[in-house]
Amino acid sequence: MQKIMDSAVAGLGGYSNGGYAVAINPHTGGIYGMAGVYRDPNTGKTTVDPAGAINQSITMGSVVKPAMIIGALKSGVITPDNNVLTDMPIKVKDTPVKGSWFNKSGGANVALTASDALMVSSNSYMMQLAMKEAGFKYSYGATLTMPTSIFKKLRNNFNEFGLGVRTGIDLPGEVSGLEGKSTAKYIGSALDLSYGNYDSYTTIQLAQYASILANKGYKIQPHLLQSIRANGKDGKMGAVKYEVKPNITGVIDVPDSYWDIIHSGMYKVVHGTSQYATGTAMKDINPAIAAKTGTAETVYKNTDTITLSAISYAPYDDPQVVVVVAFPNLASDKSSINMNTLKSIYEAYWKDVQSSDGYKTSK
């Protein structure tokens, strides 16, 4: 896995900081692989940096959207049977127009279910959810009068999914991420928070979060240690003296109908027929995966960059493994590195860790 990340980062230039990846068992928290490369954007020099997966805070982008939808369902602003909103550019007073990547000007306004909003990665849908959760009735050009408590409400929901809080991994140096400012002056940034373009998280947090999505609600502590064995008399490993057991640190207890929306949407990200489905470059991965891609608009030294990420699990209908990746501060011409890297990691997983026999066909 480290070789895969080395190869991926080797082709990067500009202000790229490198990249990070984690593969994890969504049912036990056991880490199959954790890899990373730090790239000095000033010199281009790279350093092997797997610990960056737990101590580098990155603005991850749209990968947060499944959590945003679950939060909105829990709040009751949408329901499993009533969740259609129109994707349209959002304009509030004294703030530039914010919109979805495929509908910046309003020429592609379209009604979306929550599941389809994931498929096409609708920023507009998430902003509308945030405004609904804040009790703000939106109209074009209106003054955004949301209370600052919306920051806490959105963050509390993300925290339940492991975003913005330490996972408790059995390594020193883990950080919780970074929060943007939350005063009334920055209330417009609550809209950015709703689609992942404000706060920063770590790659290990993405792994725990994606595991929660895969296992339908169980927040499990990630761990590298699997077991401790005694020394055998012949120099070989002896009996198991201690074995790490899954440590469930929280449960998101919601109806299966909520998870069905998320799983359907993440499947359609990869296998959907919409021209705007964001992950179809991964449709040939076998066994089939479900995923959510992420793109954050970032800035480095006054230069616009993008940060690409992805969360995924496979097989989509019986998750055995979660794979997540993050590549901060890229030039826009590297727009598929997140998906290409996922492909390579899955190929290695099914070859070296677990046989894909029995998972070749979908249910």
Predicted regions and their residues:
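Feature responds to low-complexity, polar/acidic, surface-exposed segments characteristic
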Residues: 14-16
